[in-house]
Design a protein with these regions (language model features):
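Secretory pathway targeting signatures of secreted, lumenal, and periplasmic proteins
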Residues: 19-74
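Signature of long, low-cysteine stretches enriched in small and polar/charged residues
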Residues: 29, 36-37, 74-120, 177-180
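C-terminal single-pass membrane-anchor helix
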Residues: 158-192
Length: 192
């Protein structure tokens, strides 16, 4: 019975997918399509809260394509504008860097913006989550939950994959060294 309820809950959750970019994730509860957000360049899709929790407006979640893969080099705080801070998010076993910023909207209301880049194998994407400043803590939790549900292959190697490749490379170098030594010993014996 518990498995049936779990399966039903999963079916009721809305999934965002892109076969072209190779990802799938569960949309936060209460978020619905926001086609106006796709008007910006390279936006794949956007969603907003159907019923905003805050009286100051709805939160918006968007996916933007990056037209390339993401390297592992870290951003430096000194390269960021003064109003932007580095934050971190978890995806699979990777620590992703993100940006947090507060901005003034029309009418003087403050809004937060959270951005993180996801190193998908086919093409990296950026996830944006923005909303009223009074919802920032909730927004951070929603972006973390979204990343936790995001499925897709990464172009980054996990620590296990890196160790495996290092072990394979070391094995080849050892095999080459043994072969060279064997040839030298064989030549010496023939010359003697």
């Amino acid at each position: 019975m518990t498995h049936l309820l779990s399966a039903l809950v999963l079916l009721l959750q809305t999934q965002a997918t892109s076969a072209e970019l190779g990802y799938r994730f569960t949309l936060p509860s209460g978020f619905t399509a926001f086609p106006e957000g796709r008007a910006q360049k390279d936006m794949v899709d956007c969603w907003s809260e159907a019923t905003p929790v805050s009286a100051h407006g709805a939160m918006i979640l968007c996916v933007q394509r990056m037209h390339g893969v993401l390297p592992r080099e870290a951003m430096k705080p000194e390269d960021l504008p003064a109003s932007t801070q580095l934050v971190s998010f978890k995806w699979k076993e990777f620590d992703l860097q993100g940006l947090r910023s507060l901005a003034s909207q029309q009418g003087g209301e403050q809004a937060f913006v959270l951005v993180t880049q996801v190193p998908l194998r086919r093409e990296a994407v950026q996830l944006f989550l923005s909303g009223p400043a009074d919802q920032e803590v909730r927004g951070q939790a929603l972006l973390s939950e979204t990343l936790a549900s995001l499925e897709g292959e990464s172009n980054w190697l996990t620590s296990t994959e890196r160790a495996g490749r290092l072990g394979t490379a070391a094995g080849w170098w050892i095999a080459i060294a043994v072969a060279v030594i064997a040839v030298l010993v064989w030549k010496r014996r023939r010359a003697a």
